[in-house]
């Protein structure tokens, strides 16, 4: 009886999400431009080893001298089964961003995406009521500065994440859609995971908004409009050690038998391993570990190595498993558009790598000092390292990206 009730709930959720026109692959939705929301792998009718297990590591906010070494170590430590270096996605905001170091992460194969210019802390009065114009200006101005000061090619800037995951509904998606972004990764999913409920509905794979989304809305305003070809990369909630859901790693807490507040390395490792295996031993939906570098800085504050060592142990563990690829979100989406079995992934254009890294296009970076005209009266000085010359007259900011 309970199973029947849960099935009825699932069907009702789907009907609410898709409305009268259900999305049906190869009938009214065709790759690579359209993909129905689904909890099934493209190879779900074959043994699990046919579906690669993607792990997406993402970091939000500025790339700085403080976190750059940590990121570089990850890139130089881990390689995928095809012999290519692991890649990550950086959702970048402007203040304190070192555009030269960011450029180097891109040169080494990682993805640079947009997180807004201002990243204002006032969710209630700024992000929550933000209209189309606010979202467009925040996204487009940041994209332009990634190009202007970091020499990131426009065609490589595809993704967006809303500050504080405050999804901005149709206004946000329309702004991204009109501005040439191809995906958003701001939208947490709780009900569509491999662990939620007595009989989980399953974890969502990335999908496009050609049809109404069935995804539950836990933060912000989720879209109820159609944006053909626009991808949603669901942020599958993790189950932390308290038994609570969390979309970002630094929001996950809890305890096991010996350690409180996730300060124990074993707790961190076991927490990540447990959540990863929900997908790896389940439907193999892409598994995201989304965080801020500040989570690792807490180790220094607490005179601990728990976060860093637990995280690295987890990456070493998954790096030893077959069919597991640590890749940027844009590569996952390229696979969704043209899925190949894990054993053939080496021939996929998005998963090849050059014998030698490309030469840098950031040949002579410059560091500019700004003490006046800063966006926050509490700021005394801001340094901005960039690939282009000369230094802008004023500190570049929203609405004045050239610093005139």
Tell what function each PLM region has.
Residues 204-213, 229, 364-391:
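Low-complexity, serine/threonine/proline-enriched polar segments
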Residues 203-279, 288:
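Aromatic-lined glycan-binding groove of carbohydrate-active enzymes
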Residues 20-113, 118-122, 132, 143-150, ...:
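Active-site beta->alpha N-cap acidic-glycine motif
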């Amino acid at each position: 009886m309970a199973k029947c009730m849960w099935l009825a709930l699932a069907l009702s959720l789907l009907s609410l999400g898709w409305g009268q026109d259900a999305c049906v692959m190869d009938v009214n939705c065709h790759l690579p431009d359209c993909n129905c929301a689904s909890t099934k792998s493209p190879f779900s009718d074959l043994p699990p080893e046919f579906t690669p297990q993607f792990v997406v590591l993402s970091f939000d906010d500025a790339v700085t001298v403080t976190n750059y070494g940590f990121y570089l170590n990850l890139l130089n430590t881990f390689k995928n089964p095809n012999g290519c270096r692991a890649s990550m996605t950086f959702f970048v905001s402007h203040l304190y961003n070192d555009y030269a170091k960011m450029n180097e992460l891109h040169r080494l194969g990682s993805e640079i995406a947009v997180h807004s210019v201002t990243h204002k802390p006032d969710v209630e009065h700024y992000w929550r009521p933000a209209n189309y114009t606010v979202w467009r200006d925040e996204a487009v101005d940041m994209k332009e500065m990634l190009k202007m000061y970091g020499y990131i090619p426009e065609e490589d800037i595809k993704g967006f994440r809303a500050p504080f995951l405050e999804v901005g509904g149709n206004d946000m998606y329309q702004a991204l859609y009109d501005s040439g972004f191809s995906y958003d990764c701001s939208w947490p999913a709780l009900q569509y995971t491999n662990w939620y409920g007595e009989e989980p509905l399953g974890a969502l794979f990335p999908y496009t908004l050609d049809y109404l989304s069935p995804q539950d809305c836990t933060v912000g305003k989720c879209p109820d409009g159609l944006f053909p070809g626009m991808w949603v990369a669901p942020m599958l909630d993790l189950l932390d050690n308290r038994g609570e859901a969390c979309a970002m790693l630094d929001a996950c807490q809890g305890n096991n038998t010996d350690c409180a507040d996730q300060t124990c390395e074993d707790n961190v490792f076991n927490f990540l391993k447990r959540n990863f295996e929900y997908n790896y031993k389940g439907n193999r939906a892409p598994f995201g570990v989304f965080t801020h570098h500040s989570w690792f800085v807490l180790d220094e504050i607490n005179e601990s190595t728990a976060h860093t060592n637990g995280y690295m142990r987890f990456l070493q563990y998954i790096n030893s498993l077959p069919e597991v690829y640590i890749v940027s979100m844009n590569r996952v989406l390229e696979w969704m558009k043209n899925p190949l079995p894990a054993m053939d992934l080496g021939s996929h254009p998005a998963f090849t790598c050059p014998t030698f890294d490309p030469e840098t296009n950031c040949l002579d970076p410059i560091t500019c000092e700004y003490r006046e005209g800063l966006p926050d009266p509490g700021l005394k000085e801001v340094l901005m390292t960039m690939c282009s010359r000369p230094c802008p007259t004023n500190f570049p900011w929203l609405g004045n990206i050239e610093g005139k």
